[in-house]
Amino acid sequence: MNWLSDFVRPKIKKTTPKEIADDLWLKCPGCGELLFSKELKKTWYVCPKCGHHLRLYLDKRLKLLFDGAHTELELPETKEDPLKFRDSKKYTDRLKAYRKATGNQDAIKVATGTIGGIKCVVAALDFAFMGGSMGMAVGEGIVKAAEYAVKHRIPLITVANSGGARMQEGILSLMQMARTTSAVNMVKENGLPFISVMTDPTTGGVSASFAMLGDIHIAEKGCLIGFAGPRVIEQTIREKLPEGFQRAEYLREHGMVDIVVTRSEMKPTLVKVLSILTHQKIECAMVKSEPAKNKK
């Protein structure tokens, strides 16, 4: 006989709420609307309310651009922490944390495949990995992509999505500005097209190097493009900047960008430009840039 079980009523088990994923709902930076992430995927992370372009993860960016399957190129290994840098935490610890969070080795991926049936190589940066900052690994990636383009006689496309140079690598990071500039110039000297795609943001050392050297500059609607940010400029010159300053549309009006497109228009626009620059016919009559729906 157990008096606890016989005379004391068992307590009702406390129910615990189910855990909700952190990224289930996203707030639109443009209009403040709460957006269901599952619905956002259908629009390639463009707000259906105001049309604001939220940042797109690297793998989704590559999926958006290529016709179907694409092959990622293996990038040369670089020394992880040549300066033994430490601020509030070790640089090596930061790298480990971002690799775990993004699943990527660094802020760049280089892939080859077809866009509208035209073979090309794409080097894309990822803001989710340390703000897409350009260090030695990113520099190596751009150089690798350029060398691959020259070797296989195909166009080079870069997709900038970066806050600039990586401060944890100091002068070694700034050196990549010269290296990437030389790399894309090599592509041009070989008579091959180089298309620079700019997304939000394209700033700092990336905008001051390869990102602004394309034969054609294509920017996503509303993206920030510049060297220093508008807030820094206003604090320095102590003047209010013009409305829309450093946005894609402003740069197009002032001759720094050739084409401004929405995300859904990006691939069809690239196909048209590639077909003109390579003198190739587009293999597909219509290029779809919407995510494929799962077949039932």
Predicted regions and their residues:
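Gly/Ser-rich catalytic serine loop of serine hydrolases
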Residues: T199-S209
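Gly/Pro- and small hydrophobic-enriched strand-loop and loop-to-helix capping segments
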Residues: G214-Q235, I259-P268
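Short amphipathic alpha-helical segments
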Residues: G170-I171, A208, P230-R231
